[in-house]
């Protein structure tokens, strides 16, 4: 198929011309911050395992998305010696309105990085590793090869360890996607993040239909592989828009869906439109499961890699 030009099938739903003024008005500038509800309070990052993992990452010159993206689950995950390693440096070539990862001109790709990531995975004794990266629009094929190399290195240095890769869109480059899929990760994850109407503000440089076609193409290349995607809520979307995204993802064969609350990293990032309650997350999960996903992880603090190993096992068991 001509994957890179096959967006027209769903493009009629991508309402890019709608005004985004509501998004910037959803939180008054002078409004005092409300107390954080109990369901958004996470474990503080302390303890021996936390400090051991931090030292290991520093000693191998590695980055984790847990730190760079200010993940609220870092305390819980690092306590259990699980982390999401972020490759291709620590500078992203895009400026998404929700993301805390630093932006700028990245250094040349470090092709020794996969070996060091695998060394860390082996040292931690992980049974399941999650690997992601910044966007590297300056070198799409090189970025894809890094993912393939890290899968190969983990299987060499840590036999039996499963691998989930959370990949960027590679600007719809079929060769780049095939390089990653051919490496056969246990789970291939690519996040849609939000509803089409909000893409211009939330996901600078990305396209909703491109993300859907990436997931579709990955499933066509490897029908037996597990694919996954995630969305944030609380950015100004409507429930009906979320359900449309769920249906689109189910329609391209996506197996696992994660749904979590958007939390503003700083005043320089997009404001929060509203906080969803645990009950609302349960309702979203119920609706998504009815659409055919093998597994749905839905909750205020859910992020792409949260409970990733358990998600993969549950999705595989449901086949």
PLM region descriptions:
Residues 91, 95, 100, 125, ...:
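Conserved functional loop/turn residues at catalytic and ligand-binding sites
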Residues 90, 168-171, 236, 301:
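Short, surface-exposed acidic/glycine-rich loop or hinge patches that mediate macromolecular interfaces
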Residues 65-77, 88-103:
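Local cysteine-cluster metal-coordination motifs and their immediate loop/turn environment
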Residues 90-93, 126, 193-195, 262-264:
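Short connector loops/turns at beta-strand edges and beta->alpha or beta->beta junctions
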Residues 67, 87-88, 132, 166, ...:
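A secondary-structure boundary/capping signal
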Residues 100-116, 123-175, 180-214, 228, ...:
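Core AdoMet radical
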Residues 2-3, 7-84, 115, 119, ...:
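Auxiliary Fe-S-binding modules of radical SAM enzymes
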